[in-house]
Amino acid sequence: MSETKQTVFDRLLQERIVWLGEAIDDKLANEICAKILLLNADDPKEDIFLYINSPGGSITAGMAIYDTMQFVSNDIVTVGIGMAASMGQVLLTSGTQNKRYIMPNARVLLHQPLAGFGGTASDIQTQAKLILDMKYRLSQITASRTGKTVEQIMEDGDRDHWFTAEEALEYGFVDHIRTE
């Protein structure tokens, strides 16, 4: 008789909590997307909680999570804990309006997408255009959720810009600082 060992993350999932606690890559994004879709299938009306403690990561992997968050009918409650940096910031900010939280000691990082690429001059030109397009799209998403302009988001994110919980609330990344 084989016994299945339940992990703490399985237990959290039973409570409709999805934990994003590392750098975002394709494997993690697939797991997060699958969990959100599973919770949506279980109950398309009950809130889904996405806790974020992430340094960011792959933009395309993060956009898969973002698109899944927008696709499901559930409200997505986001909670920033520790840090929500880069793509983690985009996901934190993309939670359902008025259901975006940050813990009092968490930090948020807004910055430009990072890229490392090589190849022929034509390849580099193509990749540079792609990352500039991604920068603009991420700025559009953040602007639509914060009430800022795309231009303001792009200017503020031109260099690493760290926010305290209070500053993140004031900027519009989140709606509430969670103290309890």
Swiss-Prot record:
Please give the InterPro entries that the UniProt record associates with this protein: ClpP, ClpP/crotonase-like_dom_sf, ClpP/TepA, ClpP_His_AS
Q: Which PROSITE patterns match?
A: CLP_PROTEASE_HIS
Q: Which GO terms describe its biological process?
A: protein quality control for misfolded or incompletely synthesized proteins
Q: Which residues form the active site?
A: 86, 111
Q: Name one GO cellular component term.
A: cytoplasm
Q: Name one Pfam family in it.
A: CLP_protease
Q: Which Gene3D superfamilies match?
A: 2-enoyl-CoA Hydratase, Chain A, domain 1
The record's listing under SUPFAM superfamilies reads: ClpP/crotonase
Record GO terms (molecular function): ATP-dependent peptidase activity; ATPase binding; serine-type endopeptidase activity
**Reactions this protein catalyses:** Hydrolysis of proteins to small peptides in the presence of ATP and magnesium. alpha-casein is the usual test substrate. In the absence of ATP, only oligopeptides shorter than five residues are hydrolyzed (such as succinyl-Leu-Tyr-|-NHMec, and Leu-Tyr-Leu-|-Tyr-Trp, in which cleavage of the -Tyr-|-Leu- and -Tyr-|-Trp bonds also occurs)
The record's subcellular locations are: Cytoplasm
- State the function annotated in the UniProt record: Cleaves peptides in various proteins in a process that requires ATP hydrolysis. Has a chymotrypsin-like activity. Plays a major role in the degradation of misfolded proteins.
Query: What family does the database annotate?
Result: Belongs to the peptidase S14 family.
Subunit structure, as described in the record = Fourteen ClpP subunits assemble into 2 heptameric rings which stack back to back to give a disk-like structure with a central cavity, resembling the structure of eukaryotic proteasomes.
Q: What is this protein called?
A: ATP-dependent Clp protease proteolytic subunit 2
User: Which taxonomic lineage does the organism of this UniProt entry have?
Assistant: Bacteria, Bacillati, Actinomycetota, Actinomycetes, Micrococcales
Q: Which gene encodes it?
A: clpP2
